[in-house]
């Protein structure tokens, strides 16, 4: 069965089991009893080329559900934002689906990760079907890259692929500012997450299209983001100097991330 048909059937079959508390008229809110790792929203102040970023998350995981969370603020010049990487995390049991993220490279060698997610309440679990039924709000998690990657490689046992985007420094900085604008917007005007229309990959595509309209078309490879890296390659948003399969093999950082977990040089080591 073709993946898109499987995905559609999954939504139809599981989605028929509408939760008892579901209401089509409920408004999105930032005021709920959130999972601790999703309880604090980031925000940003931008004054010309000066950026202050509040509440950058760093979770220290014992297991996926046992962790300590700390937040710190960062101040830097926009000129310090130099590169951006596209990160793909295929679902273990259905690799045509995936979580996607961005990671911005800074002049000091650090990385600022951006993960667009369903914002879960305490004791709530994610499901594709519930995500289509206004059961989750949307959150932009701004975090230490090690937090975002090792959560997935070590504690969710999923592969992670990190691709350097082909973009000028000016384009990277414009993308970063557009992301921060969205972060601030959601702090004031919460939205529902939607599995098909307002998810990790559609939001990242929206940011890119805001800078250059129609760069990324809405289609199957957005609905099935496990193939979004191949779409990025076809659109020359990733390095096309080598065959895609070679690039993909180089982008796999799972083993490196597990080996470098806890290292102060985590971001450098996974890119070596």
Sequence positions of predicted segments:
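Regulatory N- and C-terminal appendages and interdomain linkers associated
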Residues: 17-20
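Short secondary-structure subsegments characteristic of cysteine-rich extracellular domains
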Residues: 10, 78-81, 226-231
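Activation targets extended, charge/polar-rich intrinsically disordered C-terminal tails
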Residues: 178-272
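Sec-dependent signal peptide recognition
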Residues: 2-7
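Glycine-rich catalytic cores of cysteine/serine-nucleophile enzymes that process amide/ester linkages
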Residues: 51, 56-160
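Membrane-interface segments at or immediately adjacent to transmembrane helices
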Residues: 22-74
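C-terminal motif of bacterial Sec signal peptides marking the signal peptidase cleavage site
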Residues: 13-15
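Charged, low-complexity helical/coil segments in non-catalytic cytosolic or luminal regions
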Residues: 145-148, 152-177, 187
């Amino acid at each position: 069965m073709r993946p898109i048909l499987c995905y559609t059937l999954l939504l139809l079959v599981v989605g028929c089991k509408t939760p008892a508390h579901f209401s089509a008229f409920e408004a999105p809110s930032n005021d709920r009893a959130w999972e601790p790792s999703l309880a604090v929203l980031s925000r940003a102040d931008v004054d010309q080329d000066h950026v202050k970023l509040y509440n950058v998350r760093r979770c220290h995981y014992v297991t996926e559900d046992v962790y300590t969370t700390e937040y710190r603020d960062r101040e830097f010049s926009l000129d310090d934002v130099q590169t951006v990487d596209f990160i793909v995390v295929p679902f273990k049991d259905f690799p045509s689906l995936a979580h996607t993220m961005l990671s911005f490279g800074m002049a000091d060698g650090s990385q600022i990760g951006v993960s667009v997610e369903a914002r879960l309440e305490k004791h709530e679990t994610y499901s594709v079907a519930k995500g289509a039924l206004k059961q989750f709000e949307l959150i932009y998690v701004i975090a230490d890259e090690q937090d975002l990657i090792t959560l997935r490689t070590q504690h969710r046992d999923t592969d992670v692929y990190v691709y350097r985007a082909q973009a000028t420094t000016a384009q990277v900085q414009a993308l970063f500012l557009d992301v921060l604008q969205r972060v601030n917007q959601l702090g004031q005007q919460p939205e529902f997450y939607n599995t098909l229309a307002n998810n990790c990959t559609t939001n990242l595509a929206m940011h890119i299209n805001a800078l250059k309209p129609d760069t990324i078309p809405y289609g199957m490879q957005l609905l099935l983001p496990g193939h979004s890296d191949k779409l990025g390659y076809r659109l020359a948003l990733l390095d096309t100097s080598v065959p895609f399969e070679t690039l993909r093999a180089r982008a796999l950082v799972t083993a490196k991330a597990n080996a470098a977990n806890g290292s102060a040089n985590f971001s450098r080591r996974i890119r070596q």
